Amino acid sequence: MAQIDEIAPDLYRISVLVPELNMQFNHFLVRDDEPLLFHTGMRRMFPVVSEAVGRLIDPASLRWISWSHFEVDECGALNQWLGAAPNAQAVCGQVGALVNLQDFAGTSRACTG
């Protein structure tokens, strides 16, 4: 189960504890006209994170999906999120897009910032 905390107006931290790793992972949702999910989490965390996002917005309404760097806990569930949010674009830096994103995501729905 995820813990949701509003850390600023319409900015939410979604925290998920993975007991077998004894680690907590944080994901951030900006609730806006064009909602942003920052950090997708690992693929195995997708059901928990998407349920938490669903308590705040319709996950299909996500417009932007981004992360700080390319590792499984930051963007491992990217493809699941792109499937759940048909109008969402993945957003990352140019080098990340060239080196990782287009190969990993297998989609042209990528944007560099």
Indicate residue ranges for each PLM-predicted region.
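Active-site HxH/HxHxD metal-binding segment of metal-dependent hydrolases
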Residues: 45, 54-113
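Conserved beta-strand hairpin/beta-sheet module of binuclear metal-dependent hydrolase folds
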Residues: 2-57
